[in-house]
Amino acid sequence: MNPLDLIAKRAYPYETEKRDKTYLALNENPFPFPEDLVDEVFRRLNSDALRIYYDSPDEELIEKILSYLDTDFLSKNNVSVGNGADEIIYVMMLMFDRSVFFPPTYSCYRIFAKAVGAKFLEVPLTKDLRIPEVNVGEGDVVFIPNPNNPTGHVFEREEIERILKTGAFVALDEAYYEFHGESYVDLLKKYENLAVIRTFSKAFSLAAQRVGYVVASEKFIDAYNRVRLPFNVSYVSQMFAKVALDHREIFEERTKFIVEERERMKSALREMGYRITDSRGNFVFVFMEKEEKERLLEHLRTKNVAVRSFREGVRITIGKREENDMILRELEVFK
């Protein structure tokens, strides 16, 4: 078979809808990156640095990430960056023999595994959304989003440690950490077979800049840096991340609003009789049977609203207050 035909058969693109609607499908931050901080980014850019292959990661960015992590056991040799958290995930699938994940989970795990031709194992979460017993070990990388995407619920520390104790490598995807406020990064003191992945896309309103970072043992970071592309995160993107961390209080205040809106929406949805998860992300998840879900999606299409459909239900991103009010009204009418 022609190699291009083989790729077309096994891999498929990540597609999004047009943005000519109320778009609550991709868990983007409803607030734009502050204009005064955009101005600061461009004031701090050195035009001469634009002509060179700029260091990635930038040592100053690594120092700021370490300060943000606020631990006493990590050094610059424990951190690297990626072109979004997605690149880190993609590279890790090249580093290990097999990728393991637990649907419902982040859809890109399967997309990336198929794209790179990786061996992968999907084992569904239990009915109560816990990590199942699974036969894994050295050579496997187990991807666990925490809070989970798309459901938003949180896995217990004991569940993570159960996988770590098998010897499999655990990629703990904390993309939504800021909306939960609790991290298992301290497990790095105990386990070398762990990497914590984070992103600037969600809480810091920088999805378009593509900046993620990974925290792990020095041995893992050394291996990751050998496999990832050189100069993988642009000078400009790294500057945006540095400025964001310099003004983190702005984003913490915005995150507080998003969390309050999430809790308001969860309360309203429960009162309407919807079955939802206890989401700790910047979204809510509503369980629905296929027929009901399809009817809701069609209803929302007539209102020019996009949410994300999954086999188990729908995920709704927390938007601006007026967007949240609107979606609640439509869900009440639909009910």
UniProtKB/Swiss-Prot annotation:
Pathway: Amino-acid biosynthesis; L-histidine biosynthesis; L-histidine from 5-phospho-alpha-D-ribose 1-diphosphate: step 7/9
Top enzyme category: transferase
Entry-linked Pfam families: Aminotran_1_2 (PF00155)
InterPro entries assigned: Aminotrans_II_pyridoxalP_BS (IPR001917), Aminotransferase_I/II_large (IPR004839), HisP_aminotrans (IPR005861), HistidinolP_aminotransfase (IPR050106), PyrdxlP-dep_Trfase (IPR015424), PyrdxlP-dep_Trfase_major (IPR015421), PyrdxlP-dep_Trfase_small (IPR015422)
Keyword Nucleotide-binding belongs to the record: no
GO molecular function term, any single one: histidinol-phosphate transaminase activity
Keywords from the named record: Amino-acid biosynthesis, Aminotransferase, Histidine biosynthesis, Pyridoxal phosphate, Transferase
Cofactor entry: pyridoxal 5'-phosphate
Modified residues (N6-(pyridoxal phosphate)lysine): K202
EC number: 2.6.1.9
CDD domains for the chain: AAT_like
Domain of life: Bacteria
GO biological process: L-histidine biosynthetic process
Gene3D superfamilies in the cross-refs: Aspartate Aminotransferase, domain 1, Type I PLP-dependent aspartate aminotransferase-like (Major domain)
Catalysed reaction equations from the record: L-histidinol phosphate + 2-oxoglutarate = 3-(imidazol-4-yl)-2-oxopropyl phosphate + L-glutamate
Alphabetized NCBIfam families for the sequence: hisC (TIGR01141)
HAMAP family named among the record's database cross-references: HisC_aminotrans_2
Family under the similarity heading: Belongs to the class-II pyridoxal-phosphate-dependent aminotransferase family. Histidinol-phosphate aminotransferase subfamily.
Subunit structure: Homodimer.
Name by which UniProt lists this protein: Histidinol-phosphate aminotransferase
